[in-house]
Regions:
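Acidic, mature catalytic/reactive cores of soluble proteins
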Residues: 1-210
């Protein structure tokens, strides 16, 4: 992951590349990716599937600051916050682009939209890897990996007809590490997660990091 940070993350351009440098005039043939011009799609551009997996990897390593930073970098709305940014990006800022160009004169231009499976991966990266909320059978496993500066967050989760309001507190400014888990004011101790019941009621879940 250090190599990814060193060679593939371009914060100035808002890009997370698939690889670098792109294939151009090479003796050996790497396959179909050379059919794209350098810096476009799989040929050294940002290929968003792999970029999102980088977010998931940093969260798995416990680096909530980097995971959230790269999640924001990939968020399409951040590519169009200014008129200049929107002109450069050119595609819709409210859907995930499958790719973003990485070579002049089209650095930062969005590619194909509305069809990429990386949109689903982006959703999972935010919900499961950063907020740490995962459904496992009839249990809700909560293991956030968030920026240290976050004081916490709140999520309302619906399980059939029941509602679970999850409050995560981060009093010590850490990225990961659950020290307390409560359901309706009762400590759950060593349980693997929050047991879910479809009772039509509302339940409070408290998670403390430390």
């Amino acid at each position: 992951m250090a190599a990814v940070d060193d060679h593939l993350v371009r914060l100035d351009a808002g890009l997370l590349l698939l690889f670098t440098p792109p294939f151009d005039d090479t003796v050996l043939e790497p396959g179909y990716i050379k059919g794209y011009v350098p810096g476009v799609r799989e040929n050294g551009g940002q290929y968003t599937h792999a970029a999102v997996w980088t977010v998931i990897a940093f969260a798995a390593l416990g680096d909530g600051d980097r995971a959230a930073e790269l999640f924001a970098l990939l968020n399409p709305i951040n590519h169009a916050r200014t008129p200049a940014g929107a002109e450069r990006y050119k595609v819709e800022p409210y859907v995930i682009a499958a790719d973003v160009y990485a070579e002049p004169p089209h650095v930062g231009r969005g590619g194909w939209t509305w069809y990429t499976g990386s949109a689903g991966w982006m959703y999972r990266a935010g919900l499961e890897s950063i907020l740490g909320i995962r459904l496992r059978g009839t249990h809700l496993v909560i293991d956030p990996c968030i920026p240290q500066a976050w004081a916490g967050f709140r999520v309302a989760f619906r399980y059939h007809d029941a509602r679970y309001v999850i409050r995560v507190e981060n009093p010590h400014g850490v990225s990961r590490g659950v020290t307390a888990l409560e359901l309706n004011g009762v400590a759950l101790g060593g349980q693997a997660g929050v047991p879910l019941v479809n009772d039509g009621g509302s339940h409070d879940v408290r998670v403390v990091l430390g």
